[in-house]
Amino acid sequence: MKNKKSRARSILTFAVKVMATVFIFLLLFGFAEVNNVLHPPRIIPEGKTLRKFDIEYHDVDLLTTDGIRLSAWYTPPHNGAVILLAHGYGDKRPEWVYEMLARKGYGVLAWDARAHGASDGEISTIGYLEVLDVKAALDYALAQPNVEHVGAWGGSMGASTLILAAAQFPQIEALFVDSPFTSLNDELDFLIPYPVINPLAKFLAEIETGIRIHEISPVDEIARISPRPVYIVQGLADTVAPPDSGEKLFNAAREPRTLWAEENVPHQQMYLDNPRRYKRRLLAFFDEWLLGNYGTHGDFRQNG
């Protein structure tokens, strides 16, 4: 009997040790993964595309209300309208968008998000504190001469951030967003579909940032943008964000709203798949809503 009890106790002790070891491993693994997410790779922008097309731009510094210096480029407008450009997670200033807008007379302001590129900042909050980055850019643009209207383009994380920002700041008059996510909670559920690791990752992220995951929810804020227009671009072969994100955001938004979704297009690849159509729709959208020039580049709502 004693041997049986001793054996049972040994088995129980071993099981507890194994469980403790697994828990510690998951905890350490989770901390490492969360730390990697909060510290994205830095890609320093070079401006090669802008120089190739002889686009005038100035290096400027923006300062957020929480004291973060952001490195940016600014091109003054020839038509009275400036477009803010917010890039995605781990990405850089989108020179391809900058070029197509600047060559059509738009002013452009593009910056490295906090903890990205040449900007200061220790961690990325994937949309939460990045709203302060947008506010710093918006304030800078509105303070420049010959600026009468401000619109915004965003990709991926930048798209989601701009939805949150535009819901707060009515000075953003028109919003074009490419591959946004509906909420950070949905995004993490999509990228980490594992019963134990998923809640652990969310818990650790909240500890590291002091931010509630559920507070980063563009789908709950997008309706506040109306009556200003929002244009949503969604590739239905997205593997970075849920491919139904665009439809959910469109359904949550109010008029005026537009959804452009295409089969077999990955995350933020619509331009590569349809470059002429993308450019035409982007310019037509801002021409109509910021300049009042309907049909200059065709109807942004139509195929073709």
Each PLM stretch: what is its role?
Residues 265-276:
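Catalytic histidine-centered segment of alpha/beta-hydrolase-like enzymes
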Residues 274-304:
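Catalytic active-site module of serine/aspartate enzymes centered on a nucleophile-bearing elbow/loop
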Residues 65, 70-140:
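Membrane-embedded segments
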Residues 239-245:
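Conserved alpha/beta-hydrolase "acid-adjacent" motif
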Residues 164-214, 220-223, 261:
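Hydrolase active-site cap/lid region
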Residues 11-63:
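An N-terminal hydrophobic leader/cap segment in hydrolases
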Residues 145-156:
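Alpha/beta-hydrolase fold nucleophile elbow
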Residues 225-226, 231-234, 238:
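Short beta-strand/loop motif that positions the catalytic acidic residue
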